[in-house]
Amino acid sequence: MTLKVLVVDDSGFFRRRLCEILSSISDVDVVGTASNGREGVEMALKLKPDVITMDYEMPVMDGITAVKEIMRVQPTPVLMFSSLTYEGARVTFDALEAGAVDFLPKSFEAMSGDASKIKRLLHDRIKEVSRAKYRMSGASAPASVPQPAKPAAPIPVREPPKPAAPVTRPAEPRAKAPPAKPEPKPEVKAAKSRRTPRQDYKVVLIGTSTGGPVALQKILTRLPGAFPAPLVLVQHMPASFTPAFAERLNRLSQLSVKQAENGEILKPGWAYIAPGGKQTLIERVGAQARVKILDGDERLHYKPCVDVTFGSCAKMFPGKVLGVILTGMGADGREGCRMLKETGSVVWSQDEATSVIYGMPMAVATAGLSDEVLALDEFAPRLIDGVG
């Protein structure tokens, strides 16, 4: 089927270039463009696109406000474009919490160069985002248990954007691509009907991709500060984003959250974010677990890679690891979970109904590796009941 895309961006160059690239994809139809958030909301109502690409810093109405309004009046999967800066990361997490599905780095250099690589990336991402379960505004924000807040980190204030003249441009109609035949849905093998018994795990590993920032925030903000095991979080994310993500989770939760550093010993009550652009391994030092950070292997698609982290931990602590796979596209984590199971450890995965993208957890479940399949809201209580 042809996917209808609405492009919202105040940069005339970026808007035109993005439209050119998207229009060259046979099963994508750019149905309109907008130069600010207010126009984006109006055109979303009028055109009812399948996917909206959204900048965050725009005149009249910024991207985050536009996402909230779109989720209220015309819920539609939104793909954010964000700068690779601390401020870009901060507002991207706000946009994801408001209801956006995923994000891509906004690179004028990449957009002005060879389009073949960015074309493949955009095509894959837009197809995945179009399948996402969007969330209504208000219901999208993770509901956390009321807890004493940590001191808030100072929030950078950005300069007001320069005004830009509104420009909208409906795309010229093109021939529709022939409808694709529906693919058979993989069968999810039933997980064990009983709950896995409470165990004294040495480490809890959580792997996720698309939809993960909101899912992780929802889980971590419901865990007590005295959680009895360390958590290692592997989220597919650029290197410039993981420090800001760790700071956000640390500010919002009672756990201590930080980006993992090479050589540090994992401690209960702490959550460690695998740094972007590198691989995070867990090694054993006596009875303790220690972090080992390596430069990302160029042969691996994901940096950080869930399979790498899970696999490194499997033989170090046989039968003493809990692996959790949350929402995300692709199958990263399946082989790592297989290694955990082969060494006697336990695996939980997220269910289809509450996954933004049911890719990674489906890969684990269909391979028969999940001991429990849980809804997103069930993970925090199960972690509290099952770990310790």
Swiss-Prot record:
Biased composition (Pro residues): 148-164
Record field: catalytic activity: [protein]-L-glutamate 5-O-methyl ester + H2O = L-glutamyl-[protein] + methanol + H(+); L-glutaminyl-[protein] + H2O = L-glutamyl-[protein] + NH4(+)
Active site: S209, H236, D332
One Pfam family matching this protein: Response_reg
InterPro entries: CheB-like, CheB_C, CheY-like_superfamily, Sig_transdc_resp-reg_Me-estase, Sig_transdc_resp-reg_receiver
Enzymatic class: hydrolase
UniProt KW Phosphoprotein keyword: yes
Highest taxon in the source lineage: Bacteria
Residue ranges occupied by any CheB-type methylesterase domain in the UniProt entry: 197-388
Compartments (UniProt record): Cytoplasm
CC terms in the record's Gene Ontology section: cytoplasm
Keywords of the record: Chemotaxis, Cytoplasm, Hydrolase, Phosphoprotein
Modified residues (4-aspartylphosphate): D55
Keyword Phosphoprotein: yes
GO MF term set: phosphorelay response regulator activity; protein-glutamate methylesterase activity; protein-glutamine glutaminase activity
Ranges where the Response regulatory domain occurs: 4-121
Modifications the protein undergoes after translation, according to the UniProt entry: Phosphorylated by CheA. Phosphorylation of the N-terminal regulatory domain activates the methylesterase activity.
Segments of this protein annotated with the region Disordered: 137-196
Function: Involved in chemotaxis. Part of a chemotaxis signal transduction system that modulates chemotaxis in response to various stimuli. Catalyzes the demethylation of specific methylglutamate residues introduced into the chemoreceptors (methyl-accepting chemotaxis proteins or MCP) by CheR. Also mediates the irreversible deamidation of specific glutamine residues to glutamic acid.
Protein name: Protein-glutamate methylesterase/protein-glutamine glutaminase 4
